[in-house]
């Protein structure tokens, strides 16, 4: 039997607010994954300590461990749109300051770990807000497709970000 209620997976992208947020999410996620490759490589150029290289992953994952539950509550309590803007600005600021610090050769392992922590802090707060705002942007019929597109964006970024990071490191 044919399901006449089928909604195309791409249908939510015809909704401008969802499309803009989805696109911004992909760009942000690609930046996050690119940073993971770049930060690990940069740490190896700053120190030969395997412990410090491992600390990059700790600085990346610790905010998710510490702040995922509070971030979910924040997504329920605060205006999700403003929370998304705040977290994106936090991550943008951390990335810009990290870039400037690195360009001017003032980077140290501690500074790299600090900026990595703040980038992941932003991402850990951003994720529940992004997931919670989707039902506000699309119709109930489009919700499954919109959630699927959210997963697609994460996986696209998970492939593209490290590849981009590798190209940047190799350049």
Language-model segment annotations:
Residues 1-171:
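Alpha-helical transmembrane-bundle signature of multi-pass membrane transport and export proteins
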